[in-house]
Regions:
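Generic alpha-helical structural signal
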Residues: 9, 134-137, 338
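Intrinsically disordered, low-complexity terminal regions of plant proteins
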Residues: 244, 248-351, 355-378
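Class I SAM-binding transferase module
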Residues: 169, 174-295, 370
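Solvent-exposed amphipathic alpha-helical surface segments
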Residues: 18, 143, 344-348
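Class I SAM-dependent transferase core
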Residues: 2-103, 119, 132, 146, ...
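Conserved nucleotide-cofactor-binding alpha/beta core module
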Residues: 82-192, 196-200, 204
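Short, functionally important structural connectors and interaction interfaces within domains
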Residues: 13, 55, 60, 78, ...
Length: 378
């Protein structure tokens, strides 16, 4: 067994052990599709800088369960290969199967398209960056993948030439769902997308249902597009229409330089801090109830905060339930945050998958998107 094959097998073991990989056919795809081929120009490691094929640690890095940054612009990541466990979860959630036509928004390295093609799907991947699209297409050819094509284009518009699609996979953080994707989707089709929510991009499952009523004079427009939570996540944000804001959106995340010094106002609620997944469950719930919620750096990382109007203060919610606060209205924000945390705990600490929202048109009127309006527990 080659080094790469052994590392692939080890990655598969990790994904299956952690519960992100349950399908046998997808397990075979991860065990056979060579991720290193899709990283021919290397990736940016936090520890070792740019790692290229042949460098010490390159293959080991390729087969860690990590997202790998593949392109920087002014020092900012603009393209990557997503975390394998997240890829597996999204592919399983989408229910990708042989014979399906898949529209992928955001080509990345082409690895995700290769995995779906290995399941027998016909994948059309669209990326707005010509160099990213070209490299992904080259990698797919090198890997011998015949069931996927990569096109240069505005993801907002989808790709009519391959429609209708059974599924839409979105691999870039968006603020809403393009009407073009819905128009190019078969009846009963599904979309899985990371949609902006409270400073994060949790993965949502989007579907349509027959309208509960027909719109009549004096009635609001019918709503038949729904979203449900899948898991917490962070993705690089899309620009243009797919990144447009809307009046009831959460505030943008704040920079470390803008955030005032925090002081503890309420001590820990739980003896053991929530793990990453459960903390994102809490964060999602807080954001569903309070539009002041976003992300901000504190305590060595980025976490959930209620942001005040100055964007330099408010309340931060820690994984152990403690509340930190800063600013002129620190006490008020801390009290509000504590009430929200207790509400979530009293409801049994609901996970992201318990939330559902109707989608309504928002964003740029010239290029609208469907965005969540109000979230409810189901």
């Amino acid at each position: 067994m080659s080094e790469a094959s052994g590392l692939r097998a080890r990655l598969v073991d990790v994904l299956r052990r952690d519960g992100g990989l349950t399908r046998d056919d997808l397990t075979r795809a991860f065990a056979t599709v060579p991720r290193e081929v899709f990283l021919a120009d290397g990736f940016h490691s936090q520890d070792a800088g740019l790692l290229r094929p042949g460098d010490d640690g390159f293959l080991a890095g390729v087969y860690r369960n990590d997202a790998l940054v593949t392109k920087l612009a002014d020092g900012r990541p603009v393209s990557s290969s997503s975390q394998p466990s997240l890829m597996a979860l999204m592919i399983e959630e989408l229910g990708v199967a042989a014979g399906m036509r898949i529209l992928e928004i955001g080509a990345g390295t082409g690895y995700n398209a290769a995995l779906m093609a290995a399941l027998g799907a016909d994948v059309t991947s669209v990326d707005v960056q010509p160099d990213v699209a070209a490299k992904a297409a080259d990698a797919l050819r090198t890997a011998g993948v015949t069931g996927a094509r990569v096109l240069i284009g505005d993801g907002y518009l989808g790709e009519p030439s391959g429609a209708p699609y059974d599924r839409v996979m979105v691999t870039v953080g968006v603020t809403g769902i393009s009407p073009h994707w819905l128009a190019q989707l078969v009846p009963g089709g599904l979309i899985v997308a990371p949609v902006a929510h409270a400073g994060n991009n949790p993965v949502l499952r989007v579907w349509t249902e027959p309208a509960a009523r027909i719109a009549e004079p004096g009635w609001p427009p019918r709503t038949d597009i729904w979203a449900g939570g899948v898991c917490g996540a962070g993705f690089m944000a899309a620009g243009g229409a797919l990144g447009a804001t809307y009046p009831w959106a959460h505030p943008a995340s704040v920079r470390a330089a803008d955030w005032a010094a925090l002081e503890e106002v309420e001590t820990a609620r739980w003896p053991q801090p929530l793990d990453g997944l459960r903390y994102h469950d809490l964060w999602f719930g807080i954001g569903a109830w309070d539009r002041r919620t976003t992300g901000a750096p504190y305590d060595g990382g980025t976490g959930c905060v209620l942001l005040d109007e100055t964007r330099t203060g408010g309340a931060a919610i820690l994984a152990d339930g403690a509340i930190l606060a800063a600013g002129a209205h620190a006490a008020t924000y801390a009290s509000d945050a504590g009430i929200l945390v207790d509400r979530w705990a009293d409801l049994g600490m609901p996970g992201i998958e318990r939330w559902r929202a109707a989608l309504v048109l928002g964003g740029d009127p010239a290029a609208p998107i469907y965005v969540p309006r109000e979230w409810s527990l189901v």
